[in-house]
Structure formats: structure tokens, C-alpha cells
Amino acid sequence: MSQLEPRQQAFRNAMAHLSAAVNVITSNGPAGRCGITATAVCSVTDSPPTLMLCINRNSEMNTVFKANGRLCVNVLSGEHEEVARHFAGMTEVPMERRFALHDWREGLAGLPVLHGALANLQGRIAEVQEIGTHSVLLLELEDIQVLEQGDGLVYFSRSFHRLQCPRRAA
């Protein structure tokens, strides 16, 4: 791995202070079934519902995602830190085994959908732009499933943290 320039390191350190929801992006199709943990996910518009995802161009998943053309963004709950670690490659668990360890269901076009996630957002890649080290994917959503409540999982200061959902007063 090459040495980072001071500005690159400063940027990475600054981004470590940006709390972000933890997601596992999954795909299935002719190029295979896979997934990756990602925090670079944000909404673009609700007309039509569209997300923006940023995936490192050196990631094996980048090629698979583009070839399959369909993705599911699984917004992880506070109970899913182990799932996040597996799909981030922090464990030695091989890809196919990762899907066997947790409650994955089949969604549109066979997309892996994590049961119990705070949200499952399934769609097709509508546009791709290459910017620096990353591919920016615009995902036009075709199916949206949302849990009514649950604790969130965020990544902050280079570690996972459970974010407690405010409880409604009785």
C-alpha cells in the first residue's frame, strides 16, 4: 500500500469524525452473489426514489455490482454489527458463508435481503460515474421495505456504535 499524502491522511481523519449509517449492499445475478459493508450511501431524490452509493474501484464487488446491475441496500440495525464485520472483510468468513450465517431472504430478481434490517432498498443501477478512486452509483429504487423502529448502527471514529432509537412516551 502506498504512503498517503498529508492532505489525503487529513481527509481520512476528518471523515472518521463523520458519523454514518452502516449498510450492507448486496447483489445477485450473472456475475455472482456478493455483498459489502458501506457507509457512503445517501438519498438523492424521492421522485423517483434514488440513492447514491460510492464503491472503491479496486473492490471486487465493484465489477460484480456493475455487471449484475441490481442492488439491495440493507440498512443495518444495532443488532447487526457482526453482519457488518463479515461483509467489511474484518473476519475470515468467505462470501457464501456470510449469507448462511444470518437470516437472508430472496428479494426482487433474487437480491439478498437481510431480514430484520431497518430498511431494505432494492433497485437497479441507473447511472455510474467514475470519480477518483471510487465509482458513484445512482440506484433507482423499485422496492422499499422499512421497519417501524429499531436501534441503528453507525460508524464513527473508525468503529461501530449502536445508536439507540428514542422510545415513544406511553
Swiss-Prot record:
Activity regulation, short description: The rate of FAD reduction is independent of the presence of HPA, demonstrating that, in contrast to HPAH from A.baumannii, the activity of the HPAH reductase is not allosterically regulated by the substrate.
EC number: 1.5.1.37
GO molecular function: flavin adenine dinucleotide binding; flavin reductase (NADH) activity; FMN binding; NAD binding; oxidoreductase activity, acting on NAD(P)H; riboflavin reductase (NADPH) activity
GO biological process: benzene-containing compound metabolic process; pyrimidine nucleobase catabolic process
Pathways per UniProt: Aromatic compound metabolism; 4-hydroxyphenylacetate degradation; pyruvate and succinate semialdehyde from 4-hydroxyphenylacetate: step 1/7
A Pfam family assignment: Flavin_Reduct
Annotated InterPro entries: Flavin_Rdtase-like_dom, HPA_mOase_red, NADH-dep_flavin_reductase, Split_barrel_FMN-bd
Reaction(s) the record says it catalyses: FADH2 + NAD(+) = FAD + NADH + 2 H(+)
Practical uses of the protein: HpaBC can provide a biocatalytic synthetic approach to the production of hydroxycinnamic acids that is an alternative to, or complementary to, conventional methods such as chemical synthesis and extraction from plant sources.
UniProt KW Membrane keyword: no
Protein keywords: Aromatic hydrocarbons catabolism, FAD, Flavoprotein, NAD, Oxidoreductase
Assembly and binders: Monomer. HPA 3-hydroxylase consists of a reductase component HpaC and an oxygenase component HpaB. Some form of interactions between the reductase and the oxygenase facilitate the transfer of FADH(-) to the oxygenase in P.aeruginosa, although interactions are not required in other species.
Role noted for this protein: Reductase component of the 4-hydroxyphenylacetate (HPA) 3-hydroxylase. Catalyzes the reduction of FAD by NADH. The reduced flavin is then transferred to the oxygenase component HpaB. Is also able to reduce FMN and riboflavin, but preferentially binds FAD. Has no activity with NADPH as the reductant.
Family: Belongs to the non-flavoprotein flavin reductase family. HpaC subfamily.
Name listed for the protein in its UniProt record: 4-hydroxyphenylacetate 3-monooxygenase reductase component
Organism: Pseudomonas aeruginosa (strain ATCC 15692 / DSM 22644 / CIP 104116 / JCM 14847 / LMG 12228 / 1C / PRS 101 / PAO1)
Top-level taxonomy: Bacteria, Pseudomonadati, Pseudomonadota, Gammaproteobacteria, Pseudomonadales
